[in-house]
A protein has these predicted regions:
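Metal-dependent phosphodiesterase/phospholipase catalytic core, i.e.
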Residues: 10-123, 138-141, 145-151, 161-163
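Short catalytic/ligand-binding loop motif for oxyanion handling, primarily in non-cytosolic enzymes
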Residues: 3, 76-78, 178
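Residue-level recognition of short loop/turn positions
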Residues: 2-3, 193
Length: 206
């Protein structure tokens, strides 16, 4: 935020999912806190407000929830973002409970150099010409491909797992593709419908 708070939000600006306008980097936390970020989705979510990163970490620590945190720093630059995220995680001793990802692979390289104890993942949504060479040069722990890329290039599973990397795929919202990703051996499925995913995973495991 303008006053240096780390907040949880999907977009760089607030228009799409709130009753406000403007970029988060140009707004103070108090200004953001005045926004309703739930009503756009459904009246039952009206009155929801933006959380700080610290609030989310505290919730995850209390509930023992594993957290996949995406840094949204590929469109807007946020100074010292990596170190500030690391500081918040480490002061709560949650290095093994959080893994961090981004489409900004340079940021993830820097993050891993600053803190080898926190797992990092590289998000991507387009094929690479020479992925084998790319992962050889990477210090990331995980790969986060869009699920269709694993269907288009099934050999990627063997490549990533052969390098000791976890494969966490996104965003899988329908049952057939959930089953397909499980069958391919992915380590994690990111979905907008966790209730459906849990049911599918239970059915497959049974």
């Amino acid at each position: 935020t303008k006053d240096g708070k780390l907040v949880i939000f999907h977009d760089a600006s607030v228009e799409r999912t709130s009753n406000g306008t403007g970029f988060i980097k140009d707004m103070t936390y108090d200004e953001l806190l005045s926004l309703d970020i739930g009503a756009w989705k459904s009246p039952e979510f009206a009155g929801q407000h933006i959380w700080t990163f610290g609030q989310l970490l505290d919730f995850c620590k209390e509930t023992k929830m594993l957290l996949n945190m995406e840094l949204k720093n590929y469109e807007v630059f946020y100074e010292n973002l990596e170190q500030r995220v690391i500081d918040e995680i480490c002061k709560r001793q949650m290095q093994e409970q959080v893994f961090v990802s981004s489409f900004n692979h340079i940021s993830m390289q820097h993050f891993k150099e600053l803190c080898p104890d926190i797992e990092t993942g590289l998000l991507y949504d387009k094929p690479y010409l020479d992925m084998e060479h790319y992962v050889q040069r990477s210090n990331a722990d995980n790969m986060h491909p869009r699920y269709m890329l694993l269907q288009y290039q099934p050999e990627l599973m063997e490549l990533f797992h052969g390098r000791g990397m976890k494969v966490n795929t996104w965003t899988v919202n329908d049952e057939e593709n959930m089953k397909d990703m499980i069958a391919r051996g992915v380590d994690c499925i990111i979905s907008n419908h966790p209730d459906v995913l849990c049911r599918v995973a239970d059915d497959v495991c049974d």
